[in-house]
C-alpha cells in the first residue's frame, strides 16, 4: 500500500473514532433494547489495528480507541487502554475500516470467552451503527429516527474533525470564513426534534448538539421530518429536488450550503 493510501486509511480510522463511535450514545439513550442491554454494564471495549510505525507518534505501529461504558453512559477515548475487558484487533487499518463500513473483515478478539455477554452486546451496538449505511433502508419508525439522528450527529462531528485532521480541501474552505454557524435541525415527530451544528471561525471548527443560541445561523438546513431527511440522505431525491418537494428548506447562503453538501458527500464516501 502506498503512503498516501495509508494516510487516507489512518484519517478514515480517526474519523470513525472521533465521529462514528460517539454516536453510539444515540441508541444507548433512545433505543429501549440497547439501553436495557447496557444497563449496569461497566466495561472497557477496545478497537485497534496494526499500521506502519511511521504513522504513529510513538512508533508502536498500532492505533486504536477505547469505549468506556458506565451504566448506559459512553466515553470514547482515542488511545490504547492498558486493561480493556474486550479487544477487537485488526491486522490493518484497511481491515478495520472495512468492518466499520459494514463490510467483511475478521478481527482477532481477546476477552470474548471470558466476557461473552459483553461481546454479544457490543456486536449488537455495532449493528446499530450500520443503520447509517446508504444501503440500510429501515421500515421501523424507531430505526428510521435513529438512522437520521445518528447521521446528522456523525456528519457534523466528522466535518469538524476532517478540518482538524488537515484535509486540504476542508482547510481551504474554512480558512477565510468569519464566525459562522451551519445548523441542521430535524422534526422528529413522536420521538422528538433534534439538531446539531458546525461552527466555523477563521480556519477553526467545532461541532455541537442542539440549536446554537448565541448567533443566527449562516446556513440552516431544516428537515421537516425524519421521512423528509431520509429522502435526501438516501438520495431518493436530489438535494435541490428535496427543497422543491418540501423535504428540506435552506435558510441563508445557497452557495455555501451547496459547498458544504459537497464536503458531506466526500465524507460519506469515506465512511460508508
Question: Where does each model-flagged region fall?
Answer:
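Feature captures hydrophobic
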Residues: 1-272
Amino acid at each position: 500500500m502506498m503512503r498516501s493510501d495509508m494516510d487516507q486509511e489512518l484519517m478514515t480510522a480517526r474519523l470513525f473514532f472521533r465521529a462514528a463511535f460517539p454516536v453510539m450514545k444515540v441508541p444507548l439513550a433512545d433505543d429501549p433494547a440497547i439501553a436495557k442491554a447496557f444497563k449496569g454494564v461497566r466495561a472497557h471495549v477496545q478497537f485497534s489495528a496494526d499500521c506502519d510505525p511511521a504513522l504513529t507518534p510513538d512508533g508502536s505501529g498500532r492505533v486504536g480507541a477505547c469505549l468506556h461504558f458506565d451504566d448506559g453512559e459512553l466515553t470514547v477515548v482515542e488511545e490504547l487502554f492498558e486493561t480493556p475487558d474486550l479487544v477487537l484487533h485488526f491486522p490493518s487499518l484497511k481491515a478495520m475500516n472495512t468492518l466499520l463500513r459494514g463490510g467483511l473483515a475478521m478481527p482477532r478478539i481477546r476477552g470474548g470467552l471470558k466476557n461473552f455477554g459483553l461481546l454479544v452486546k457490543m456486536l449488537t451496538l455495532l449493528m446499530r451503527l450500520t443503520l447509517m449505511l446508504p444501503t440500510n433502508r429501515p421500515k421501523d419508525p424507531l430505526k428510521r429516527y435513529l438512522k437520521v439522528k445518528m447521521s446528522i450527529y456523525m456528519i457534523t462531528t466528522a466535518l469538524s474533525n476532517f478540518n482538524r485532521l488537515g484535509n486540504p480541501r476542508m482547510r481551504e474552505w474554512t480558512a477565510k470564513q468569519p464566525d459562522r454557524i451551519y445548523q441542521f435541525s430535524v422534526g422528529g415527530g413522536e420521538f422528538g426534534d433534534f439538531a446539531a451544528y458546525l461552527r466555523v471561525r477563521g480556519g477553526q471548527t467545532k461541532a455541537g448538539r442542539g440549536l446554537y443560541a448565541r448567533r443566527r445561523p449562516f446556513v440552516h438546513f431544516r428537515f421537516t421530518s425524519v421521512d423528509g431527511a431520509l429522502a435526501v440522505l438516501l438520495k431518493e431525491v436530489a438535494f435541490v429536488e428535496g427543497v422543491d418537494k418540501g423535504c428540506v428548506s435552506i435558510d441563508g447562503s445557497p452557495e455555501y450550503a451547496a459547498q458544504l453538501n459537497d464536503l458531506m458527500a466526500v465524507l460519506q464516501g469515506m465512511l460508508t
